[in-house]
Amino acid sequence: MNTAIQAALDHAVQTLQQEGVLPSDWNNSSNLTRTKDRSHGDFASNIAMIGSKAAGMKPRDLAEKILAALPEVADISKAEIAGPGFINFFLNADQRFAILDQIQAQKESFGRSQSNAAKKIQVEFVSANPTSSLHVGHGRGAAYGMTVANLLEATGAKVDREYYVNDAGRQMDILATSTYLRYLELLGQNLVFPKNAYQGDYVKEIAQGIIDKDGDAYVREVANVYKDVPEDVQYAEELDSEGNKVVLSGDKEKHIDGLIANSQQLLGEGYRVFHQAALHAILDDIKDDLADFGVTFNQWFSEASLSAKIDEALETLDQRGFLYEKDGNIWFKSTEFGDEKDRVVKRRNGQTTYFASDIAYHLNKLQRGYTDLVDIWGSDHHGYISRVKAAIDAMGYDSKKLTVLLVQFVSLWRGGEMVQMSSRSGQFVTLRDLRKEVGNDAARFYYVMRKSEQHIDFDLDLAVSQSKDNAVYYIQYAHARICRMLEKAASTGLQFEVSAARSHAARLSLDAETEILAKLAAYPDVVLRAANAYEPHQVGNYLKELAALFHGWYNEHKVLSDDAELTQARLLLSINVQQVLRNGLELLGVSAPEAM
């Protein structure tokens, strides 16, 4: 319906341009939206307020001219001017009921469209280092990324979901060396485990797996492993005035780097055994965790596979004049593209930087023919956006193809108090822990109920409560309530048939019923707006509002009554609410239970 109204408004604009009321080059950037207040009609346009300056007249005066030039629109009973110059459109009664036919015809497809059918989009998300289990912060990125991808698919886009596996960096070497040191410990070697190594028990489990398979084949003298390694950091017993540790001596970074170098030299090819065992153990754990959370990927892309692409990317930048040498390092001229400073891409020792890998990865993405790239990063990567976009432009591509969405941190609350997010050893509360406590549905829902760049205070008590204050429970309960109502109707021998019930739709004459019909009709627009804005919370809020309308109506008015025609009409309305709730919950990755 909004398409027909918008076409009529466009026609009116063309007429007024021909008459000289509006400039011929005026671009109509107005919005046509569904009204929130039923007294204001079904749709409202701000076109007169947008165009008033160009027309040189007051918005209400322009609105009158637009109405005069507006062609007749089928199923619109009237259009009127309101407030400072809004144009409100009122649907006739038959058109309001048409949404019931549309939902029943489209079922699971209702709300889906082909609006973004021309787009091939890659959504890269989570991409956590495979060095430990996913924590609750990663969980938010997982839920958000999966739901954004779902929404884009629902609007017709071809979407690939990708996880970038950081399997070639220093953190993996720290994990591999941590595993080797635990391996030596488990085989009776005495050593002081480094403070900057990975401390979790899972490292011992990986090491034990290597022992079970290969025994003591990789044992080397501990003295040689620690030979010429700089001293590990030593801390004072007391914290400083700000609660931070006070360094007395040593350097934890140089210490672990020395252990990595010695382990690699002593083990030779055997070092890869520890590297790969640790990588696969953690990556398998991450894959299982995400799959259990309903988050899946088309591609798990290995950073280690990028070596040739790094050379290609740097050669491209060099040929285009955007690399230079200084102090033995190779630098990228990112300041020429608005970055705050130039960036090193290759160090004097010949090692390329993580940034060089990221440039190569985005070159690889662009060469795969995507129309749009969506990267979902943690908020701490904010400063990284400008340099990546600079590299894309410098290689001759359009950085506007890349959208970077930042995901803020998550705080957990229980009993009105913030939950300690990490232990003394630095182990964060895991996604698996959260899912075990509140369930997948609550986690998936509450993770996306705020804009991604906004901090989330996750109330664990609320997430498991059975009350209307718990939005996901309230929505699911509306769906289950309708299922129970239909079962009750069937148990009494009531014969419900959609086409017959449709003939009695005019009995849905209450304001509450008209409001529900309007809310149902708004769903496709909500999905499209949420997809284009990368804002899943719009769908979540819509479902909350629809559930509230249904519960309020159900509590005040009997659906199953002695009035057969009214019963049929209200059952028809209910099953349409049920369908839309189910469709919306599916996009959010939340179940629609039939009983609660």
UniProtKB/Swiss-Prot annotation:
Family named by the database record: Belongs to the class-I aminoacyl-tRNA synthetase family.
Enzyme Commission numbers on file: 6.1.1.19
A Gene Ontology BP annotation from the UniProt entry: arginyl-tRNA aminoacylation
Subunit structure of this chain's protein: Monomer.
Entry protein name: Arginine--tRNA ligase
Source species: Acinetobacter baumannii (strain AYE)
Source organism superkingdom: Bacteria
Residue positions of motif 'HIGH' region: 128-138
Catalytic activity reported: tRNA(Arg) + L-arginine + ATP = L-arginyl-tRNA(Arg) + AMP + diphosphate
Location(s), subcellular: Cytoplasm
GO CC terms: cytoplasm
UniProt xrefs under InterPro entries: Arg-tRNA-ligase, Arg-tRNA-synth_N, Arg-tRNA-synth_N_sf, ArgRS_core, DALR_anticod-bd, Rossmann-like_a/b/a_fold, tRNAsynth_Ia_anticodon-bd
Molecular function terms, GO-annotated: arginine-tRNA ligase activity; ATP binding
Keywords for the protein's UniProt record, in alphabetical order: Aminoacyl-tRNA synthetase, ATP-binding, Cytoplasm, Ligase, Nucleotide-binding, Protein biosynthesis
